[in-house]
Structures are given as C-alpha cells and as structure tokens.
C-alpha cells in the first residue's frame, strides 16, 4: 500500500537526518582566561579592592616594625582576647611587641584570634590561599572567630591557577593535605536566603600586607 505523500516526505527527511553527520563542536581552549584581566597593573591594589569588596579588613604596612605597631593597636582597640600564634616566624616577629599571645594549644577551645601566614594572595578574587603545611595547620585559620593573615607583596599573584602553581613548585608531589581559599569572612545564606557571617569559619578576616618590594 502506497504511503500518503506527506508521510513519505516526512519519513524521507528523517532518513536523511539520521544519515547526515553534524560537524563536531570546536575544541575548547582551556588555557585562555575566561575572566577579563584588570586594567590595574599594581596587584596589591587589585587584591585590596576585591578583598574589601568581600567584607575583608585590609591594612598596608611598609615594614615589620609598622606591622607590630598597627597590629598591637588594633588588638588594643578591638580588645582581642585569646590570640594564638603557632608559626615560628610570627612568634619571633611579635616576641618583643605589645601583643599578648599563646604559642601552644593550651585552652585552644577559647581561641578568639588566630594569626597565620599564607601561601599566596589571589588578586582577582581577593582571596588568601591557605594550606595545612605551615605550623598553623588546619585549625588556626578556621576555628577562631577572627583570622589575621600576615602576607607580603611578593606573595600576590593574579589568579587562582598562579597560586596553585606556586604551591606545586614549592611542595612538588608532597602537596599539603588541605589547600583552601579564604575570600572574606565565612558566610552562608542557606536558611531563608538570609546572609550569616561566620557560619563555617572565621567571622572576620583581616589581612596585613607588608611591602617587601624595596
């Protein structure tokens, strides 16, 4: 029985469609940045603007002595309690300052402020790249309500991939068990879309950036 001409035309188009191969989509270029680069050439300015945008507290200091003075003044003005410092370089730095801090794990459950270094600062996102490889470990950057990061201008890189490359070069195949980005205070809006700071980590993130370009 002959098919209806209109049905025959439809079936013919279907058969042609099944035999016709569509061209493959172009290969994506994963090496190309998907974000436009900032026109600002000074990475410290790029970082600071993004960091402040994400509710971080930023201080620029010219040297370690100014860092001691500024941090001691901040601790006094804000009445910082139970400050913990575990990294030897920071313990040595603040040993003669007016900052009172604990260098052991004694009463760590009371920790209010943790002072650590970082692996790098990411300018594009305004983030601190933290790892568990330092003596601060995992807890000191996460548990206290206030996290203070001490960094140098030479540690600023533009993007996340640049920071991860620094870690790869530094540690090789023995990568730290924890590598994370801190972008402003910890936050969540899971419940009724209400923003809550300090949900899964520090309620305040403070960065002191030391100019070591000279």
Which residue ranges define each predicted feature?
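The feature marks the mature, well-folded catalytic cores of soluble enzymes
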Residues: 1-214
């Amino acid at each position: 029985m002959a098919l209806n001409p209109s049905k025959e035309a439809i079936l013919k188009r279907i058969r042609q469609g099944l035999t016709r191969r569509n061209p493959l989509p172009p290969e994506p270029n994963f090496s190309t940045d998907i974000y436009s680069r900032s026109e600002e050439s000074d990475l410290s300015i790029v970082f600071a603007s993004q960091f402040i945008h994400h509710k971080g507290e930023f201080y620029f200091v010219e040297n370690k002595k100014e860092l001691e003075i500024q941090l001691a003044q901040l601790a006094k003005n804000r009445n910082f309690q139970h400050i913990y410092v575990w990294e030897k370089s920071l313990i040595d730095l603040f040993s003669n300052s007016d900052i009172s801090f604990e260098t052991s794990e004694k009463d760590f459950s009371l920790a209010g402020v943790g002072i650590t270094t970082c692996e790098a600062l990411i300018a594009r996102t305004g983030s601190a790249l933290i790892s568990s490889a330092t003596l601060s470990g995992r807890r000191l950057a996460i548990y206290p309500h206030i996290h203070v990061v001490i960094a140098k201008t030479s540690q600023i890189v533009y993007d996340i991939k640049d920071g991860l490359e620094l870690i790869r070069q530094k540690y090789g195949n023995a990568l730290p068990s924890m590598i994370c980005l801190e972008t402003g205070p910890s936050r969540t809006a899971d419940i009724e879309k209400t923003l809550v700071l300090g949900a899964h980590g520090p309620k305040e993130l403070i960065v002191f950036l030391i100019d070591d370009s000279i």
